Amino acid sequence: MESIWEKTCRGPARPPLYGKAQADVAVIGGGMTGILTALELQERGLQVVVAEAWHVGGGQTGRTTAKLTAQHGAIYAGLIERLGREKAAMYARANRRAVERCCARIELEHIDCDLERTDSWLYSYDREDALLREAEAERALGLDASFEPDTPLPLRVCGGVRLCGQAQFHPLKFLQALADRLTIYERTPVEHVEGGTLFTPRGTIEAGRVVFASHYPFVNVPGLYFARMHQERSYAIALENAVLPAGMYYGLEPNAWSLRSYRGTVILSGGAHRTGRNGGGHYAALREAAQALFPGSREAAHWSAQDCMTASGVPYIGRFSARDPQWYVATGFRKWGMSNAMAAAELLTALICDGSHPDAAVFDPGDLLQQRPGRIAEEGLQAARGLGRRVLHGPVPQADELAVGEGGPAELDGKQMGVYRATEERYYAVELRCPHLGCRLEWNPDDKSWDCPCHGSRFDVQGRCLTEPAQTDLPACCRRRS
């Protein structure tokens, strides 16, 4: 299942690390955050290496919808109310500057990545009052926003908040252009970190500073990020023979659609849900909406993405923990990774090189006063539910009762396992306990994967780890029907 970006951009293969490497800074993760941070640190004169578990852009960067905007849903009214105007202004300023810095780099360096300056729209079906509050908040924080009762959308809406001068682009074309300037080891997963030493399957990296930019920090202690975040999945479809008015569109309601265009196609996305809580049907819903909104359109690609959602409501960017002052982190972008990645690169570079940044406070992972105890308690409750379901209760079907293409808990060879029936004769079976912290995995019928509802790790039908925080594969087997 390749995204429209993966179908239209292939980067060169880079060798893995063998032996030892040394650097001033080691960056874990070769996505947008890791590559931008590594490049900015290198431009400040530091020696930097990047360790990437798969390949550059092979994680969430290649599965984004790539809206480069400081408008992140209806966030600003809530930030002002919860954190105060000063910190809300920090968030707005950091992301507004991120959009401009990213566009300036593309234009000055002549990077061919289909950059298009356009407006961003937050719409609602019937919540005009919420839109008016958000427009007022955005303007108060210095953003060029306005409430518009009429929008160009092919939807019945009550209006939209228009933020002028934002951008959209091809994320992988941009990323590969930057990656060519860096020292990157692909197929080099970091398995363990001790101080400034990174341990990988075939070697080690020694560094004075370590940046965790791997989407979800895989280190449980210190930091306890697994207790302060959850992950969500969402789904996208690229449509040919469809026309969208200029702009990027994002709905206020949970069931609203997100839309943008790319080179004659329209990207329609939505269907967000907590990872591991998927009853299926999300691609079917997208296809139904596509024909209603764009009759006669044709599907060019479909894919899904995963996002880290923080309890605090803003990303965690800064020092990883007080216990390890040489570690830094950027995570929890809450679906807005393009601008937040650029903001993180600027902020982390300043912290490492200068010791401070004027907008660091709003992103500080260690600011406990900024956390939301109720949300953290909810994350703990969700994890407790998953841990409490380690053992299957009640009867489960026999593996041969599953239809071809169907998966779920089933009995195979006298043992209860997670079983996927690939053909009439072949079954793939995995243990249903997540190797991260032991939560019971759930079947994802849309992506045909085993997903953890506690912290969001995912595995394919053969047990191979797809997303962190888990770092190891599942015990698995393949059986043929006798």
Protein language model regions, located:
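N-terminal Rossmann-like FAD-binding beta1-loop-alpha1 element of flavoenzymes
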Residues: A23-V50
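Glycine-rich FAD pyrophosphate-binding loop
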Residues: E43-R63
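Rieske [2Fe-2S] iron-sulfur-binding domain
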Residues: I237, P409-S482
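Extreme N-terminal leader/targeting segments of oxidoreductases
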Residues: M1-V25, R464, L474-P475
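Flavin (FAD/FMN) cofactor-binding and adjacent substrate-gating region
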Residues: E2-T8, A74-I80, R101-F174
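C-terminal catalytic lobe of FAD-dependent flavoproteins
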Residues: E253-P254, N278, Y283-A285, F294-G380, ...
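Flavin-dependent oxidoreductases
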Residues: V193-S261, D400
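Helical element adjacent to the flavin cofactor pocket in flavoenzyme catalytic cores
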Residues: E136-E138, G160-G208
